[in-house]
Amino acid sequence: MASIYQKYSQLIAKRPLITNIITTGFLFGSGDYLAQTLYPSSSKYDYKRTLRATFYGSIIFAPIGDKWYRLLHKINFPFPKTKVSPTVSKVLNTLTKVGVDQLVFAPFIGIPLYYSVMSVLEFHDNPLQVAREKLHAHWFNTLKTNWVVWPTFQLFNFALIPVQFRLLVVNIFSIGWNCYLSSVLNHKHDFLIENITDVDKDEILI
């Protein structure tokens, strides 16, 4: 395990973007594999669906996520902290990063980007219309579920994990989250949203 960590540390230092592209694509694909295994929609495994998830994770999300976490690393509590201890200052800075991540990236970048790009990759006759319908049906409920799952984890991530490893840690944690997103995207198991967010099923079905 130590040798794997050392090897990854070397790769992320020398080739951060390529390393994140490979690991993010693999872990997004793993999330879809898990979704299809736990909640199969048919007897036949959909390899194209897993390839779409892998493509999205590696080509779309990884470069954006890499830049986003490096940007968040530079964001701190905006008001003067001259009279507080270093510990309090660190807590305020961490809370600020989590707040920006959850109030900016999640609702306006992460969730819309996922549903939009994945709808296009499915090659529907009218992919933009499909993307709008999925966003209308799932955006708010996905966001509420996101706020149940992610803030506590991101507090840990921003407080304890070095910036170069944050996307990797998020991606590992995201295997379960990607499983959830893949299930919602393919609207075969909308009961997942109902169980987590306690909303009426009629509000989320397309």
UniProtKB/Swiss-Prot annotation:
Membrane-spanning parts: 16-36, 103-123, 155-175
Q: Keywords on this record?
A: Membrane, Mitochondrion, Mitochondrion inner membrane, Transmembrane, Transmembrane helix
Cysteine pairs bridged by disulfides in the record? none
| Organism superkingdom | Eukaryota
| Cell compartment(s), UniProt | Mitochondrion inner membrane
GO CC, sorted alphabetically, is:
mitochondrial inner membrane
One Pfam family it belongs to: Mpv17_PMP22
The way it spans or sits in the membrane comes to: Multi-pass membrane protein
- Return the similarity comment: Belongs to the peroxisomal membrane protein PXMP2/4 family.
Q: Which PANTHER family match?
A: PEROXISOMAL MEMBRANE PROTEIN 2, PXMP2 MPV17, PROTEIN MPV17
State its role.
May be involved in cellular response to stress. Required to maintain mitochondrial DNA (mtDNA) integrity and stability.
UniProt name for this protein = Protein SYM1
In its UniProt entry, the species of origin is given as Debaryomyces hansenii (strain ATCC 36239 / CBS 767 / BCRC 21394 / JCM 1990 / NBRC 0083 / IGC 2968) (Yeast)
Gene that produces this protein: SYM1
